[in-house]
Amino acid sequence: MNDNIIEQGVAAAAESSLDHSILNAAHIAADDAAIVADAASIISDSESLETEAEQAEVEQKPNGFVELGLAPELVQAVADLGYTQPTAVQAKAIPLAMNKGPNATAFVDLMVSSQTGSGKTAAFLLPVLHTLLEQQAEIEAEGRAEFERACAEAAANGEPAPKRKRKDPTNPRNFKAAAPGALILCPTRELAQQVAHDAIELVKHCRGLRVANVVGGIPYQLQIAKLQNANLVVATPGRLLDLQRSMQIKLDKVQFLVVDEADRMLDLGFSDDLAEVNQMTSQRQQTMMFSATFASRIQQLAMRVMHDNGAGVKKIQIDSPQEKHSSIKQVLFWADNAQHKRKL
């Protein structure tokens, strides 16, 4: 009898102890959840305030691309993409590339060291497209002036006014090899396609400015058709030289040469191709080279392709800032004992 009472007492004590353990564990779990919720709330509020402050600061600033002196068509295209302020590399490279310095008398060669994601593509596309727009406007103005002179002469002689001649580009008789004013070389097909896509986005408000992409893996006839009247060509070296050797493209009118990711270009063995393109575009006014670093081999390449062996080249080096990823959710878990660590 007494033994039964003792056993029942022990069982009751054990059950009571177990109940307290469960309650304590529940309280601990609830406390952990509250701590995590508070931490997440603090992080979320902090990120929200930071984002709102950044947006307010951007809204107060005038459009930075306007201040860089870019053509209105390009500024509008950039705004359509959601950008009103240039990145560090854009703010430094664009004025130099556009020959906008206070004492600038000619285009200067540029070497730019900037990491992927810094906005480097727009840093060379925007000034090149801006200059092509200016040149196109000059050509169109000369054409209008010549037509007006012809009309005046016809009127003076009592003859009917001449008609503007428009060639049908689809007619094989009107075919002529492409002669772009600007050439951008990329080490890989994927990069060339991305750069060409970005260029097309930027020229959507630019009447008459055409972009062509020349890469391997695309049928020749399709690329040849797209090359017609192209002002800017984005290419990989191999396919570009193939089309040049078959007389589908001429490089003697190239005024601006950009070598993107020059370090990868050398890694992939395009040194000889670069030398060949360099020789074919010797008449160009400007060369820009973009690379992740200014390693010695990049310096040597610059000496081979820049004017005056790189003596007058301007160098821009942008340090990579600490990245912010606002889309990543941060959660804090306190792990002060074995039970909590098992939850992780």
Describe the predicted segments one by one:
Residues 1-108, 141-172, 187, 208, ...:
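N-terminal intrinsically disordered, low-complexity tails of helicases
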Residues 78, 90, 112, 128, ...:
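Residue-level signature of catalytic and energy-coupling elements of molecular machines
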Residues 79-83, 138-245, 253-256, 315:
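Conserved nucleic-acid-binding Ia/Ib motif block in the N-terminal RecA-like helicase ATPase lobe
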Residues 89, 94, 98, 120-132, ...:
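Motif I (Walker A/P-loop) of helicase-class P-loop NTPases
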Residues 101-112, 179-182, 230-231, 285:
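Pre-Walker A (Motif I) flank of P-loop NTPase domains
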Residues 104-128:
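Walker A/P-loop
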Residues 134, 183-185, 202, 211-212, ...:
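Interdomain coupling/hinge region of P-loop NTPase helicase/AAA+ cores
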